């Protein structure tokens, strides 16, 4: 009888130990999943789809409007970021401007972004040039911000890698963009492509290409957070 009682106690102890170990493993596993499946967890990102409403931005071949492409790419990027655990603040989620004129619109975007205390600001735009042969994505940053430079370079690298763009474009400093110089938060403008190129314009209105562009930008943001120590 004593032998049976001793074995029963051993079994109960072993079962208890397994339960504790399982709970600890579950906690570690949850932390592991959050770390790797949610790479931008607890980060705050401002997405600024350029133009909107009365301001169409660039008008490309076939009357393609920049404002619509900007919003489509930004919404796709928003989805990726939120799935990755980030809090995303959009300057607009529909076809609207933030002011009655260009200056008031830009001021409103900068004020919103600055008040957000975000980790990064990503402004989405499209480019244009007199020659139809000019193509490719280019990421701009404010020349006085080292963190913005790093963010821009990482996004530029991911765009080249993921979209296979055969250009020699590199991230470039620029002091003329209003939203870049009005904030201390790391900020970049992604000029996704040239609407003046009929070839690139066709790509930029394609939903699948927009998804790939959003993914490349997302990957660049992840790389920035992974290497910034934030």
What kind of region is each of these model predictions?
Residues 1-230:
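Catalytic-site microenvironment of enzymes
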